[in-house]
Amino acid sequence: NHLDLQAIEWLEDFLLDYEGTVIVVSHDRYFLNVVCTHIVDIDYSKVKMYVGNYEFWYESSQMMERLIKQQNKKAEEKIKELQTFIQRFSANKSKSKQATSRKKMLDKLTVEELPASSRRYPFVGFDMDREAGRDLLTVDGLSKTVNGEKLLNNISFTLNHDDKIAIIGENEIAITALMQILAGEDEPDEGTVKWGVSTSRSYFPKDNSKYFNDCELSLVDWLRQYSAAGFETQNESYIRGFLGRMLFSGDDVFKQVNVLSGGEKVRCMLSRMMLYGSNVLILDQPTNHLDLESITAVNNGLKAFKGNVIFASHDHEFVNTVANRIIDIR
């Protein structure tokens, strides 16, 4: 947590060279792939060890689940076939022995009950209300100084159609300053940021405290306030649909937002982004506070998104699989 990509790489090398035993808990999939030789999986109220890295564990666990489901399906089909035969011919004298034989077969067949997994995958899907035109974003000569420290110095770049840009660098404060300027939350000291008239933007800030502190609204009312102008009275089932995607269901939607955990607040902010229907997404560390299942869901959602993305992340796998361009702030 809180390490940039270079620091994470250093830690990976250190642990690989370390001759002792390492027990690590991490939500970084790439890190687990590089460092780990064994994975201890705590699920289904059991603890099970896999020999291999994170990717091996994931494929093995998914394959085992698929295998059990396939076996159950075959068993259920066979049970149905036997039951049909028994019901049809149990009263038939010439077929009674066959019916009795099939009843014995039926008694031996079992369907393995899959226990409930503790893992829950949210659904992250961003739909655009409209596509952006050709002119998206031009950043020219951007500079910013905060408390006497030059964070951004003459930054220039353009956002092209289908671009998904990862912003990386050693200075997190500088990256956040750039994201805030792009989102219109702050102004540069020098330079210009020009967005195309057809763009609509949604911003995920690294610090979301201003959205939740001192707010006593319920989850459903909190999200409703971000509905499009004129739709503040959007029916509850519509709003709850977005919350449901992020695993808020039942009475959860009536919880006050100021008592939510860090991960729950992040899921709220993602619900808010999905509600907006923007064609450009700006995200500053969207995987902070999330578990592996939620990180995977966000990762897949951004990969599938048809619009443009500008994001900052310390998650190597996230950057590798989402971004088609990298901007390194030095």
Task: Give residue ranges: language-model regions.
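ABC ATP-binding cassette signature C-motif
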Residues: 1-70, 129-330
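Flexible nucleotide-interacting loop at or near the entrance of a catalytic core
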Residues: 63-152
